[in-house]
Design a protein with these regions (language model features):
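Short beta-strand and strand-turn-strand segments in soluble, beta-rich domains
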Residues: 1-4, 26, 43
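Aromatic-lined carbohydrate-binding surfaces of glycoside hydrolases
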Residues: 21, 32-39, 45-201
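Short, solvent-exposed loop/turn segments enriched in Ser/Thr/Gly
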Residues: 14-15, 27-34
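Surface-exposed binding patches on compact interaction domains or structured appendages
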Residues: 1-18
Length: 201
């Protein structure tokens, strides 16, 4: 949870995750500290924690060889934080989440070429990062504004080895685009091997 506080019923167990950042120049050895637990109705309690630092230093996460590929879901972050998708407030809310992922050695940026390529397998549909527009003369144009902003944002955090683009063959072969003649968005089925697929792709 990214909450500053929450209520717990009495006799209920709630795990707590504690992250400790260790500077690279820290000498090896055992380090002790206390965790203070406070409540408005009970006295303060102390828990002892011990941390053993070994004589080994990890390289920067971007240099780790393990290929970590956790899919990102920006739309979910927008809903939880009650902000508009792709707004400045959205990217501000995304930063701590994605920075945490970068610090774990994430190598891949998840992007969506079209709206919800997995046909809503998650609570929040995936928003498209590229706006496809069928112009009045039948030609196609593509707005990469969101795609470029998202990729640059992730690369600035240190995630830059690979970009996964989903998907040339989306769920149900459905393509989402804007019809310039009507100003409305249209969903059309374009199966591989058909004239419609060739024309769109």
């Amino acid at each position: 949870d990214d909450l500053s506080s929450f209520s717990i019923e009495k006799k209920e167990v709630r795990p707590v995750w504690i992250t400790i950042s260790i500077p690279k120049n820290t000498e090896k050895g055992a380090y002790n500290a206390k965790v203070l637990i406070t409540s408005p109705t009970t006295k303060q309690q102390e828990l002892n924690i011990s941390l053993d630092v070994i004589d080994m230093t990890l390289p920067e996460p971007a240099k780790w060889t393990f290929h970590l590929d956790q899919w990102q879901h920006p739309s979910a972050v927008a809903r939880v934080n009650k902000v508009s998708v792709w707004s400045d407030e959205h990217f501000k809310a995304l930063k701590p989440q994605m920075q945490m992922l970068a610090n774990l050695g994430q190598k891949v940026i998840t992007t969506t070429l079209n709206k919800d390529p997995w046909h809503v397998q998650t609570f929040d549909p995936y928003e498209d990062m590229i706006i496809w527009t069928k112009e009045k003369d039948g030609s196609w144009s593509y707005d990469y504004t969101v795609f470029d902003k998202w990729v640059s944002f992730m690369m600035d955090l240190g995630i830059k080895k690979m970009i996964n683009c989903y998907s040339i063959v989306p769920w149900n072969n459905e393509i989402h685009y804007k019809d310039a003649a009507t100003g409305k968005f249209v969903d059309v089925v374009a199966k591989p091997g058909t004239d419609e697929f060739t024309k769109i792709w």
